[in-house]
Design a protein with these regions (language model features):
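Conserved beta-strand positions that form and line the central face of beta-propeller blades
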Residues: 60, 91, 101-104, 124
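Short, well-structured beta-strand-loop connectors
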Residues: 69-71, 75-76, 110-124
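Conserved positions in beta-strands of structured domains
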Residues: 43, 78, 106, 123-126
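A short pocket-lining beta-strand/turn micro-motif at the edge of beta-sheets
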Residues: 86-88, 98, 112, 118-121, ...
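Short, surface-exposed secondary-structure boundary micro-motifs
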Residues: 47, 82, 120-121, 127
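Short glycine/proline-centered loop/turn elements that form peptide/ligand docking sites
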Residues: 109-111, 121, 127-132, 136-140
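Extracytoplasmic/periplasmic cell wall- or extracellular glycan-interacting regions that localize
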Residues: 1-86, 91-93, 132-171
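Short histidine-centered loop motifs in beta-beta connectors
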Residues: 80, 95-119
């Protein structure tokens, strides 16, 4: 019985308490639970070619213009704003040495220091791609780039995505 209660607090039900100011579960324990930050078609995957001679350190999702971007996990906003050729960049500290980088949005609606919850709207996509490295693709729609890091090193985000996340576009 106690085991079932502990399991309920660390599973998807733990995300429902919207008054939290700390992650519901440790990021390392969230494998298979995280929603994609925007629905869309995956056009580049971790470890594949980045289109400009390098290796992709995250995933790229083509979305609809104006699509809402949500947080894939609980965390603290440590950066929110323009960065080099990435368009608007959002960096979340997910705890335990994990950071989530989300780039390519047109507008960000959260502030540095803010605690955000899984699924919380944080940004909006523009009408075209904002990420310069994506220009090497044939994508004509906006592209969101998502990268997970552990202790500063990019890691494959694949194991964290929820199995029921489809590659459908929502706007």
């Amino acid at each position: 019985e106690a085991k079932a209660a502990a399991s309920a607090k660390s599973g998807p039900a733990a995300f429902k308490d919207r008054s939290r100011t700390t992650p519901a579960i440790a990021f390392a324990s969230a494998k298979g639970l995280l929603p994609l930050p925007v629905n869309g078609n995956k056009i580049r995957d971790f470890g594949g070619s980045d289109g400009v001679g390098g290796v992709q350190k995250g995933i790229s999702l083509a979305s609809k213009p104006g699509a809402q971007v949500t947080t894939p996990c609980d965390g603290w906003v440590v950066y929110a704003g323009p960065f080099r050729s990435y368009g608007q960049l959002l960096i979340l500290n997910a705890g335990g040495g994990y950071h989530v980088l989300i780039a390519g949005m047109e507008r960000i609606s959260v502030n540095i220091g803010q605690f955000v919850l899984t699924g919380e709207p944080v940004a909006t996509m523009g009408s075209t791609s904002q990420v310069a490295s994506i220009l090497a693709t044939t994508a004509s729609q906006p592209v969101l780039y998502v990268e997970f890091r552990k202790d500063g090193t990019p890691i494959d985000p694949g194991p964290w995505w929820a199995a029921n996340e489809g590659e459908k576009v929502r706007g």
